[in-house]
């Protein structure tokens, strides 16, 4: 019997996969526990429509990330921090502070974990911060650190 898996089943198939399985296994386990549905023409059409919808969503997500990248690269975020001799900061400017400043100044919310700022910004001036917006899209945000 051909079935379409609705969930991952260890050793048998992944979600959305169409496979031939024994009739007893399909009726007594997969269909009963709603792990799969029978591969009827209607269900196959529904699966195709769902795959197209998911693909369209992924494409839209990528386009949104590209647009946000262009927007970010045109912006500049200003952050103030206390500094000592020679422009060295007391402590550092973290990705959380940069994300908060971006939200306050430009109304753009980006998760601090998407900013690639391992040790923070430790000096006054301009710094380019890489921001991972999507698997394939990495933008750059210009951060200007000034003395408080």
UniProtKB/Swiss-Prot annotation:
Highest taxon, organism lineage: Bacteria
Function: Binds to the 23S rRNA.
Gene3D superfamilies from the UniProt entry: Ribosomal protein L9, C-terminal domain, Ribosomal protein L9, N-terminal domain
Single GO term (MF): structural constituent of ribosome
UniProt keyword annotation of Cytoplasm present: no
Assigned keywords, A-Z: Ribonucleoprotein, Ribosomal protein, RNA-binding, rRNA-binding
Protein family according to the UniProt entry: Belongs to the bacterial ribosomal protein bL9 family.
HAMAP family reported in the protein's UniProt record: Ribosomal_bL9
Gene behind this protein: rplI
Name of the protein in its database record: Large ribosomal subunit protein bL9
GO BP field: translation
Stretches of the chain forming a coiled coil according to its record: none
């Amino acid at each position: 019997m051909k079935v379409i898996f609705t969930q991952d089943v260890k050793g048998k198939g992944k979600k959305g996969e169409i496979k031939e399985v024994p009739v007893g296994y399909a009726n007594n386990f997969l269909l009963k526990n709603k792990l799969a549905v029978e591969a009827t023409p209607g269900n196959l059409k529904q699966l195709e429509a769902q795959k197209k919808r998911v693909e369209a969503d992924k494409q839209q997500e990528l386009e949104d990330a590209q647009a946000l990248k262009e927007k970010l690269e045109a912006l500049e975020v200003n952050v103030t921090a206390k500094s000592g001799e020679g422009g060295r900061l007391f402590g550092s400017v973290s990705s959380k502070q940069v994300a908060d400043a971006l939200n306050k100044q430009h109304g753009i919310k980006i998760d601090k974990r998407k900013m690639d700022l391992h040790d923070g910004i430790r000096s006054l001036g301009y710094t380019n911060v890489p921001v991972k917006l999507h698997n394939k899209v990495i933008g750059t945000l210009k951060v200007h650190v000034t003395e408080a």
